[in-house]
Curated annotation (Swiss-Prot):
GO MF annotation, one: calcium ion binding
PTM statement from Swiss-Prot or TrEMBL: O-glycosylated.
UniProtKB keywords: Disulfide bond, EGF-like domain, Extracellular matrix, Glycoprotein, Repeat, Secreted, Signal
Protein name: Cartilage acidic protein 1
Chief localisation class: secreted
Domain of life: Eukaryota
Residues of the signal peptide: 1-27
UniProt cross-references to Pfam families, sorted A to Z: EGF_CA, FG-GAP_3, UnbV_ASPIC
Gene: CRTAC1
EGF-like domain location: 559-605
GO biological process, any: regulation of synapse assembly
Swiss-Prot/TrEMBL FG-GAP repeat ranges: 46-88, 105-147, 283-333, 395-437
Cellular component GO terms held in the UniProt record: extracellular exosome; glutamatergic synapse; growth cone; postsynaptic density
Species, as recorded: Homo sapiens (Human)
């Protein structure tokens, strides 16, 4: 006689089955916290270095030109800060002190309501200038105080926008704006500064400020500036918000992506001559009904193409993978329901915080009307499929009551682990907060710092690291991202237990350098100099390109096309070979009806004449989350909504708020 079934076990079976399927439907939040707060030991709140004030954008550059990075903070109702890591004290210390004799005194700019900040070399002297976007007494349109562009001159930092030559030219912006970013639009090594203004009707178009070489005399310290936005094709009227720069559509030239408010996004494709054409609509990233905030660029699925991630204010967040269909570039949103869940987002940061090879995405939210915790996701690459998006535990960086306004990543203490610095403000004065990672201490890493022909940081350059086992990893040297911010000018690679084989840098002018990475160079910082003409005449040295790649005649690593190799790599039951970046896949010879063709992996038929496949089947859990996200987004658009503290009602009179909200 068979034993009777345990009734308790029978009741538990449905619950166990539910637990079994939950991780499959959506990446579950891991219990291990990613970050630990170290503010009290590294940057304790005080009057001089971490005042309780309204802060906004944050940038990373070498302010004192000693080879180490400083963290520059835009202070809105207080001074701007320049934080330097003191290795003896193991603390961040503000070097922009309130002493007129200090070479950094002018950077404080106590009168300015600074909101955005960026740094780059605009005159080719090898040292980065620092631009602060001020938005005094204005949410949009005309402000009452100009922006500042600081240059190290006469042994101190001075504002060159207030120079007589530039005052006469009327270059200094009096328009309210948000983000600023640096773009080497012609590949000259001299940068222009893109200013995302917040237009009011036909007042306050976006600007593009750069040095006028014909009117400048650098030997006498005269640096004449001009606005070339109209000439370059980027003079647009919009509610400018986030900006990010890099070779998005171009192979090397710097393109510009802007996520906007109350209007479509811009994707300015560099024509190769420093002029741009907006390709956002044709590429599928215009998102005209949402209100963009933080944005970042990365290659999330490691296919060698630059992808875009950004957050929408109380709207669905986007994770766009770049695709190529019949030779046309399109972006496809792969955001999961949890990832896309609307929130009052400000900063979006992409980095490998635990050095495990996979990129994380950090959403810095502002506690708006109620608590709003920050969120963290890992994007896990999958062979021949979309990445898996897994929600993580931010640990101390959760900050449910934080009024998040900005943030950056940098390794200020040189331990190979990225540190996270967050700024707060707008509706409540709060000090900065600093976090260190808790995971991945034993993982390998490599940091690459390319230089321009003048020796400055090569912002906008593309860095590809070829590895022994995990293929190619791509990074863009940041020229502005996050929202109001600019990350460190470093390509930081976490490698897990893998090792680098070679590295390749492509500058905005198309020049390239490839070199092997010795095993002894792991877990270090590599500086890559701009190539000299004589370097290109030498025979290329043999490169170790790693699995899936091989050295070509031009001396650089390229994807190996396994599909043309002999013997044939695919089995008989899957005879169609599809070459992919660093790999290949085999699929069946699927037959499709007229007007359709097999998709890339041969698992389905897709339309060739504009037909769209039906919606993907979703599990009950994913469907519920999708419905919840749609409901939240609908609620956000069905009634008057506050957009950064301002009613989004068009011409209707707006509620009072901080002008820079």
């Amino acid at each position: 006689m068979a034993p009777s079934a345990d009734p308790g076990m029978s009741r538990m079976l449905p619950f166990l089955l539910l637990l079994w399927f939950l991780p499959i439907t959506e990446g579950s939040q891991r219990a291990e916290p990613m970050f630990t707060a170290v503010t009290n030991s590294v940057l304790p709140p005080d009057y001089d270095s971490n005042p309780t004030q309204l802060n906004y954008g944050v940038a990373v550059t070498d302010v004192d030109h000693d080879g180490d990075f400083e963290i520059v903070v835009a202070g809105y109702n207080g001074p701007n800060l320049v934080l330097k890591y003191d290795r003896a004290q193991k603390r961040l210390v503000n070097i922009a002190v309130d002493e007129r004799s200090s070479p950094y005194y002018a950077l404080r700019d106590r009168q300015g309501n600074a909101i955005g900040v960026t740094a780059c070399d605009i005159d080719g002297d090898g040292r980065e200038e620092i631009y602060f976007l001020n938005t005094n007494n204005a949410f949009s349109g005309v402000a009452t105080y100009t922006d500042k562009l600081f240059k190290f001159r006469n042994n101190r930092w001075e504002d060159i926008l207030s120079d007589e030559v530039n005052v006469a030219r009327g270059v200094a912006s009096l328009f309210a704006g948000r983000s600023v970013a640096c773009v080497d639009r012609k590949g000259s090594g001299r940068y222009s500064i893109y200013i995302a203004n917040y237009a009011y009707g036909n007042v306050g178009p976006d600007a593009l400020i750069e040095m006028d070489p014909e009117a400048s005399d650098l030997s006498r310290g005269i640096l004449a500036l001009r606005d070339v936005a109209a000439e370059a094709g980027v003079s647009k009227y919009t509610g400018g918000r986030g900006v990010s720069v890099g070779p998005i559509l171009s192979s090397s030239a710097s393109d510009i992506f802007c996520d906007n408010e109350n209007g479509p996004n811009f994707l300015f494709h560099n024509r190769g001559d420093g002029t741009f054409v907006d390709a956002a609509a044709s590429a599928g990233v215009d998102d005209p009904h949402q209100h963009g905030r933080g944005v970042a660029l990365a290659d999330f699925n490691r296919d060698g193409k630059v992808d875009i991630v950004y957050g929408n204010w109380n709207g669905p967040h986007r994770l766009y993978l770049q695709m190529s269909t019949h030779g046309k570039v399109r972006f496809r949103d792969i955001a999961s329901p949890k990832f896309s869940m609307p929130s009052p987002v400000r900063t979006v940061i992409t980095a490998d915080f635990d050095n495990d090879q996979e990129l994380e995405i950090f959403f810095n939210n502002i506690a708006y009307r109620s608590s709003s915790a920050n969120r963290l996701f890992r994007v896990i690459r999958r062979e021949h499929g979309d990445p898996l998006i897994e929600e993580l535990n931010p640990g101390d960086a959760l900050e449910p009551e934080g009024r998040g306004t900005g943030g950056v990543v940098t390794d200020f203490d040189g331990d190979g682990m990225l540190d996270l610095i967050l700024s707060h403000g707008e509706s409540m004065a709060q000090p900065l907060s600093v976090f260190r990672g808790n995971q991945g201490f034993n993982n390998n890493w490599l940091r690459v710092v390319p230089r321009t022909r003048f020796g400055a940081f090569a912002r906008g350059a593309k860095v590809v690291l070829y590895t022994k086992k995990s293929g190619a990893h791509l990074r863009i040297i940041d020229g502005g991202s996050g929202y109001l911010c600019e990350m460190e000018p470093v390509a930081h690679f976490g490698l897990g237990k893998d090792e680098a084989s070679s590295v390749e840098v492509t500058w905005p002018d198309g020049k390239m350098v490839s070199r092997n990475v010795a095993s002894g160079e792991m877990n270090s910082v590599l500086e890559i100099l701009y190539p000299r003409d004589e370097d290109t005449l030498q025979d290329p040295a043999p490169l170790e390109c790693g699995q899936g790649f091989s050295q070509q005649e031009n001396g650089h690593c390229m994807d190996t096309n396994e599909c043309i190799q002999f013997p044939f790599v695919c089995p008989r039951d899957k005879p169609v070979c599809v070459n992919t970046y660093g790999s290949y896949r085999c699929r069946t010879n699927k037959k499709c009806s007229r007007g359709y063709e097999p998709n890339e992996d041969g698992t389905a038929c897709v339309g060739t004449l504009g037909q769209s496949p039906g919606p993907r089947p979703t599990t009950p859990t994913a469907a519920a989350a999708t419905a919840a996200a749609a409901a939240a987004a609908g609620a956000a658009t069905a009634a008057p909504v506050l957009v950064d503290g301002d009613l989004n009602l068009g011409s209707v009179v707006k509620e009072s708020c901080e002008p820079s909200c």
